[in-house]
Amino acid sequence: MKKNLHIISRVLPDSIGEELELEPGDALLSINGQPVEDVFDYRYLMNDEFVTLLIRKKNGEEWELEVEKEYEDDLGVEFENSLMDEYRSCSNHCIFCFIDQMPPGMRETLYFKDDDSRLSFLQGNYVTLTNMSDYDLDRIIKFHLSPINVSFQTMNPKLRCKMLHNRFAGDALAKVDRLYKGDVTMNGQIVLCKGINDRDELEYSLEKLSEYAPVLQSVSIVPVGPVS
């Protein structure tokens, strides 16, 4: 696991962070001796009455701070990156990708294709599961991150590989079983492409997806709308 440097961007007034004399530009290195991978590690490790923080001050000094607090209390700080990690991008080339259809000259962030299960939980984004590792699945189950929103497109593995232009897209469907067995609530989405994943293929997909109810709470059908 890589070590991330978490730079504080703001310290809230009358917070634990202010009492500890934390400042914007300080970096959180660890909590209770554990590296902090992302915001979920941060929240999980902070949920304790006694925590030990390792902070690197702007001048390079390292402070070890012992904190006694209420179990659910936060430091009251904000970080430069709210996810506290890099956003994971999509490795697929879907035949219907709406980002590929966007006109040039727009805000740069609009062209970023995210496929990050953490953003699925935090912001409701849909993920394809193709870049989700066993480690990611373990963390989702450990932290009870649900619901996770999944772009299925089809439950036919070969067809899914074709639609996503990713030879691993069919195998990724096995991860749904892990989420189901871990009691991780899911919502589904199928982008419906005429003559490809409709009719018999759609009926097959819906039949297979029904096996995951009630953990899979919904499946939305989104008719594709390609533009030139």
Q: Can you say where each PLM-predicted feature lies in the sequence?
A:
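PDZ/PDZ-like groove recognition
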Residues: 1-12
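Short alpha-helix capping/helix-loop boundary micro-motifs
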Residues: 12-17, 37-39
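Short, surface-exposed secondary-structure edge patches
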Residues: 16-21, 43-44
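Terminal peptide-recognition signature
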Residues: 17, 25-28, 53, 97
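Conserved PDZ fold ligand-binding element
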Residues: 19-37
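Short, Lys/Arg- and Gly-enriched loop/turn segments at beta-strand edges
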Residues: 34-42, 61-64
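Short, compositionally biased
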Residues: 40-54, 69-72
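Conserved Radical SAM active-site core
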Residues: 60-62, 69-216, 223-228
